Amino acid sequence: MRGLNNIAVALALSAIWSFGLDLGRHGTSGSSLLLALFRTLCKAYPFVVISHFVWSAIIWPTFFSPLRQLPNVPSDGWLSKETLRLVSEPRGVPQSDWINSLSNRPVDLARYRSFLGFERLLIISPKALAEVLTTKSYDFRKPGLIVSELKQATGMGVLLAEGSEHKSQRKALQTAFNYRHIKNLYPVFWDVAGEFATVLEKQIPTGTPRTSDTTAVIDIVDWASRATLDIIGRAGMGQGFDAIQNDDSRLHQAYRMIFEPSRGAIFLALLRLIFPERLVNWLPLRRNKRMRHGIQVIRSKCQELIRERKEKIKRQKAGVDNSGNDILTVALLNGVFTDEQLIDQLMTFLAAGHETTATALTWAIYILCKQPEVQNRLREEIRMHFPNPKGWPRSERPSSNTLQQAIDFKLPYLNVVCLEVMRYFAPIPLTMREATCDTTILHTFVPAGTRIILAPRVTNRDSALWGPDANNFNPDRWLSPKNGNREATEQSKFKIGNQKRDSTAAPEVTQEEVRGRTEARSNYADLTFLHGPRSCIGQSFARVEFAILLATLIANFEFQIEDESLLDERNISISRGATSRIVGGLKVRVRPIAVV
């Protein structure tokens, strides 16, 4: 990349020379000086942008990059129709097809070029992933452009922090996400899920027996977002947001404005490739105005939560236990964060904590509509153990431990369906890192500034890791028959809230029993929550939340896709934002299941 530095120096000298000429023509008064400087910058900036593009997108990857010797995808080369798929198809889909079509498998790394020609290094093998995510995790950071995109909605919390700052923040927050604490949240998850089912049932016309074919059509994308927002509020912040009961909830409407894909969002993203972030955010565009309003609503709510929790802690200090373990209480009692940093942490968990799980729940309902036999089998298992699937009155509700045992150990098919949904429909299909220094990955030299692609959509459907049916939705891949006996298979246990063994909680199950015939031979074969120091801190929370929401919905309702053309996934429009959110919603027909 030294050549790029030389170009920058040459352009700077050219700008200084141009500035001197302007100064000579217009004099040295204050106004003339500013005018000459402005003119010089306006003249130089396009040349800087164009020169940077020519070097980074054409000269460097074509003639100088040390990564040229790696396997290149697609096989047709950069200037081909295949490259157009990077902007016309959902993120990660083209890369997944390219990797699975390679003849010389397995490979550790592959190189491709973006639509504009910029070089990308795709991390493929478990060994390469382990080095990037664990061994050298802090050698790779989120690029500035991605940080500027995300921080508007998430704040500069643990998700975007880097280096020592990230280590400090993660350590301070870890207590709130220990599985020991997550176990105590099962009843909270179940209560919100039961409320969700009750409100959905009210959407169905009354006046006929519930055993009839009375149905209603709902947008599961919107409802899933409302449910997960209420869960993160109650379980993470100690306060519900009334999103399930009230479609006009200010917080829900704010996130709808922020996450709803639009042409304006795409246009602003393109502008950020060329112009400084502050300039783009300052532009008087409708999208910017909506973003500013939404963020203001969210920040105000976070300030309110912090203020109320501080007052509650003060009241409790007089001889009352105040050792709450929700995210906000842990962060406050730790004393590490300022109020502004606390707002950033709450914004991080509100945005990342509800949008990703809502996306997973949406895709789960979709695939169960597409495979009704899986939906029916799952419903049968759930109702066998939960005859009153909308929950219990508080006076009759089982203990946290009883609920945890039931969800984790008595519902094996629920567990594997959830695992397969997270594998097949990774909510975040692709993320990017940038090498902060000259480094190596499996002895391959990687220059500073190289863009690294970590793609759950690619890894989770890699046929070299998951077998020839990697691109099929098959929950049974996680189950392993014993002597061909399917009943024995159903006894396989996999604790969805925690992947660590607890020998006192259930019979020991080997990894082979869990993984099945097409077992994923490495933990790094499943990239949904990443791995290592930068893995998702809230993955246990998300897994349990997702499982309980899905169990409640499937136990209470039968789902069908309203528009049958969408049963072909290629007809579904998917956001090109951070998550694989379905654009325009997903209409499903809901029929209540009678309680027997």
UniProtKB/Swiss-Prot annotation:
Cytochrome P450 monooxygenase; part of the gene cluster that mediates the biosynthesis of fumonisins B1 (FB1), B2 (FB2), B3 (FB3), and B4 (FB4), which are carcinogenic mycotoxins. Also plays a role in self-protection from FB1 toxicity, probably through derivatization of FB1, and may contribute to ceramide biosynthesis. Belongs to the cytochrome P450 family. Pathway: Secondary metabolite biosynthesis. Pfam families: p450 (PF00067). Heme binds at C536. It is found in: Endoplasmic reticulum. One of its GO terms (biological process) is fumonisin biosynthetic process. Its EC number is 1.-.-.-. Keywords: Endoplasmic reticulum, Heme, Iron, Metal-binding, Monooxygenase, Oxidoreductase. Residues 484-503 have a biased composition (Basic and acidic residues). Its cofactor is heme. The keyword Ligase does not apply. SUPFAM superfamilies: Cytochrome P450. Residues 476-512 are annotated as: Disordered. The gene is FUM15. Induction: Induced by fumonisin B1. Disruption phenotype: Increases the production of fumonisin B1. Causes growth inhibition in both solid and liquid media. Increases the production of ceramide intermediates including 3-ketosphinganine, sphinganine and phytosphingosine in comparison to the control. InterPro entries: Cyt_P450 (IPR001128), Cyt_P450_E_grp-I (IPR002401), Cyt_P450_sf (IPR036396), Cytochrome_P450_monoxygenase (IPR050121). It comes from Gibberella moniliformis (strain M3125 / FGSC 7600). GO terms for molecular function: heme binding; iron ion binding; monooxygenase activity; oxidoreductase activity, acting on paired donors, with incorporation or reduction of molecular oxygen. It comes from the Eukaryota. This is Cytochrome P450 monooxygenase FUM15.
